[in-house]
A protein has these predicted regions:
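Active-site-proximal beta-strand elements of phosphoester/diester hydrolases
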Residues: 4-22, 99, 128-137, 157
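Hydrophobic residues in well-ordered beta-strands that form the structural core
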Residues: 9, 71-73, 132, 186
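Short, ordered coil/turn segments that flank beta-strands lining enzyme active or ligand-binding pockets
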Residues: 92-93, 126, 219
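Conserved hydrophobic/aromatic beta-strand scaffold that supports enzyme active sites
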Residues: 9, 87-89, 99, 120-122, ...
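Short loop/turn motifs at secondary-structure junctions and domain boundaries
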Residues: 78-82, 113, 205-208
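C-terminal beta-strand edge segments of enzyme domains
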Residues: 122, 190-278
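Active-site beta-loop-alpha substructure in enzyme catalytic cores
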Residues: 28-31, 35-47, 113-189
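Cys-nucleophile CN-hydrolase/nitrilase-fold catalytic domain and related Cys-dependent amidase chemistry
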Residues: 19-102, 108, 162-183
Length: 278
């Protein structure tokens, strides 16, 4: 296992504000371009937002293989009438390693055909044990993070699409990171609006502009509470600053990078307590 793994959180913006265009593959080419950008910057693992690019499994798998990177992509399973909101884990050889469905779809999703998945499982890879908890599963329920922590997860990915209150997203990511002491890669969609067709075929703005503020939190490389106290005293920005272990984007499209030392993560004792158990 490499001593440090570079993770890329891609805060992508849909190329069209028409919901139908996403279903028809309108974002696939842009997703591949963003993957290429992240790989050029040295990323070994790349995560897209929830439901992005939605379709294009063959193209994303081919890009992962060509670039030699792990990818977490929002690729749905099923038909438009009945489908799973799924994050698909793709290996650097282009093979699908796992599919993690959303287990607590919102009422709006259920009304539009989304089926609830069951359970969370860690994905064993040569860059560490990866886990995924999608959007509201992470923000409103503890089942996912707790299940992954019990399985020895090293890095938790939270692909999301916040249709409102995007400015609050970092607080959710930071809170879960502090609670469980694991790196959290929070990847929201870039701020955008989406239009749908109503019953009369007219285009209406279904979701006003919202999103952004992707946030990445990585624990400090310490192995005891005494070392944690010393880290607080000497860290960049001072004791009261989040500088050095919390990164966030604004509303626009962009990529956050985090270098994660998995061995150090496994030694981290948690914040203020000797265990990270809830």
């Amino acid at each position: 296992m490499n001593p440090s793994v570079r993770i890329a959180a891609i805060q992508a913006r849909p190329v069209s504000d028409l919901f139908d265009d996403m279903w028809n593959g309108g974002d696939v080419a842009r997703a591949v371009t963003l993957l290429e950008d992240a790989a050029r910057a040295g990323a070994a693992c790349v995560c897209f937002p929830e439901l992005y690019p939605r379709v294009g499994e063959a193209e994303i798998c081919a890009a992962a293989r060509r670039l030699g990177v792990f990818v977490v992509a929002g690729l749905i399973e099923g038909t438009r009438a009945r489908w799973y909101n799924t994050a698909t884990v793709i290996g650097p050889d282009g093979r699908i390693l796992a599919r993690q469905p959303k287990c607590f779809p919102t009422q709006g999703e259920i009304d539009n055909g989304v089926v609830a998945g069951k359970g969370y499982r860690v994905v064993e890879t040569d860059i560490g044990r990866l886990g995924i908890v999608i959007c509201a599963d992470f923000a409103f329920f503890s089942d996912g993070p707790e299940a992954l922590v019990e399985q020895g997860v090293d890095i938790i990915f939270n692909p999301s699409w916040w249709f409102a209150l995007g400015e609050a997203y970092p607080a959710t990511v930071i809170g879960r990171h502090m609670q469980y002491g694991k790196p959290v890669i929070g990847v929201d969609i870039a701020a955008c609006s989406l239009r749908l067709r109503d019953a009369d075929g007219r285009l209406v703005e279904r979701f006003p502009r919202a999103g952004g503020y992707s946030t990445v939190c990585v624990p400090p490389p310490i192995a005891s509470l005494a070392e944690l106290a010393e880290w607080f005293r000497t860290k960049p920005g001072g004791t009261n600053s989040a500088q050095g272990f919390i990164q966030s984007l604004g509303e626009d499209e962009g990529i956050l990078y985090a270098d994660v030392d998995v061995a150090a993560v496994r030694r981290f004792p948690g914040y203020f307590y000797r265990t990270t158990s809830p």
